[in-house]
């Protein structure tokens, strides 16, 4: 609750600051000031509704209210940038003669930047995810292994069966050895999305489909979600390890549940039955799960999602602070690499900016082929 209140206060501070800056550099008339004031009041009401009632509100209201915080942040960043330009115009002497024309240009630039940001954001957000290929070299690997990593599909009120059908069709074209689903598959109660998930039964690969939950599965009822997914043509890796394709494939429950008694992540348990002569891959939804690894765990590769690559720049800067690894392939230690997918779907409104979605196609190769 305290974190929620703190988050809301930060949003209110952003809204207040944005209003003051807009009022200053746009030199708003009285009627325009009232219009902007009511806009920020409505924005703040939407943010309060989201913070306190997001888990019980209808899906269309969830999408609408979740958009409010995105809008606040974007307007604040643009307002701060253009306020800085406006301040410079006032302070730089040789610009005084052109001050009026420059300020008019600045006003136009602000509205164009705002329009362009949202146009590009919705364009990227609504675009279908493309397959992104990445080679990864591993010690102890005998032969090439082709993997599809799907994360953050967020199947729910906006991303439905047609989206899952598209994903399955794209994946099946690659003829891979295994498909890994790295959490946040579901973003509604399972009763609302059962029919949307059925196409997952059609995923094709040599060794099958494997899944670990993300934090959103816990939000919407982890037990009924796992019970339903257990009826599909996939294997749930809940702190478990399987041996196939010349590797140890291990999976853990999500970091979000680390203080729960049930469905909590347990890396020691997940890795207990691994074959140490083979490379070990750990499927964990959040990248920061890697902080729990010890050198003795001997994990060669961690596969994660969760970050959406920030989804909306400059949110990515905040996400990187929380998760360390944002998107792509990183070397965590001399013996451990981590790949973080930007995700196939989106959370909240269909908006992505400088963070395109992806279907990660990972080609694991013996290190001697590097």
From Swiss-Prot:
The catalytic activity of this protein is classed by the Enzyme Commission as 3.1.-.-
What Pfam families does this protein's entry cite? Answer: Metallophos (PF00149)
Is Acyltransferase among the key words of this record?
A: no
Cofactor detail note: Binds 2 divalent metal cations.
Q: Where does a divalent metal cation 2 bind?
A: 184, 215, 306
- Which UniProt key words apply to this protein? Hydrolase, Metal-binding
One annotated Gene Ontology cellular component of this protein: membrane
Decide whether keyword Hydrolase is in the record: yes
Residues bound to a divalent metal cation 1 are: 152, 154, 184, 308
What GO biological process terms does the UniProt entry carry, in alphabetical order? lipid A biosynthetic process
Q: What class of enzyme is it?
A: hydrolase
State a single Gene Ontology molecular function. Answer: UDP-2,3-diacylglucosamine hydrolase activity
Q: Which cofactor does it need?
A: a divalent metal cation
Q: Which domain of life is it from?
A: Bacteria
Please give the family membership noted in the entry: Belongs to the metallophosphoesterase superfamily.
PANTHER family, from UniProt?
Answer: PHOSPHODIESTERASE YAEI, TRANSMEMBRANE PROTEIN WITH METALLOPHOSPHOESTERASE DOMAIN-RELATED
Provide the protein name: Uncharacterized metallophosphoesterase HP_1044
């Amino acid at each position: 609750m305290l974190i929620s209140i703190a988050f809301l206060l930060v949003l209110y501070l952003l809204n207040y600051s944005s209003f003051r800056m807009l009022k200053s550099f746009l030199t708003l008339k009285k009627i325009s000031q009232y219009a902007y004031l009511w806009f920020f009041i409505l924005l703040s009401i939407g943010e309060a509704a989201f913070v306190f009632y997001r888990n019980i509100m209808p899906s269309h209201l969830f999408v609408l209210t979740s958009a409010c915080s995105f809008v606040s942040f974007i307007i604040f960043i643009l307002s701060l940038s253009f306020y800085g330009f406006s301040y410079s115009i006032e302070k730089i002497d040789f610009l005084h003669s052109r001050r009026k024309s420059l300020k008019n240009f600045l006003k136009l630039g602000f509205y164009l930047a705002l329009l362009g940001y949202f146009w590009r954001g919705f364009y990227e957000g609504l675009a279908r995810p493309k397959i992104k290929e990445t080679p990864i070299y591993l010690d102890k690997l005998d032969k090439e292994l082709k993997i599809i990593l799907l994360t953050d599909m967020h199947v729910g009120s906006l991303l439905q069966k047609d989206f899952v059908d598209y994903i399955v069709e794209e994946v099946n074209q690659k003829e891979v050895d295994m498909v890994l689903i790295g959490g946040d598959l579901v973003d509604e109660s399972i009763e609302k999305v059962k029919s949307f998930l059925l196409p997952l039964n059609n995923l094709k690969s040599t060794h099958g489909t494997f899944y670990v939950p993300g934090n959103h599965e816990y939000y919407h009822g982890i037990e009924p979600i796992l019970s339903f997914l257990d009826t599909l043509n996939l294997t749930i890796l809940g702190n478990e390890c399987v041996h196939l394709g010349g590797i140890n494939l291990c999976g853990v429950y999500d970091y979000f549940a680390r203080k729960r008694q049930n469905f909590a992540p347990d890396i020691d348990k997940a890795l207990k039955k691994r074959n140490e002569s083979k490379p070990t891959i750990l499927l964990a939804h959040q990248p920061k799960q890697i902080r729990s690894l010890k050198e003795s765990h001997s994990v060669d590769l961690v596969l994660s999602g969760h970050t959406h690559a920030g989804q909306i720049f400059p949110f990515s800067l905040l996400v990187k602070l929380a998760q360390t690894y944002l998107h792509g392939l990183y070397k965590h230690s001399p013996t451990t690499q981590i790949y973080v997918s930007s995700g196939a779907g989106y959370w909240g409104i269909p908006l992505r900016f400088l963070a395109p979605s992806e279907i990660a196609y990972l080609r694991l190769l013996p290190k001697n082929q590097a």
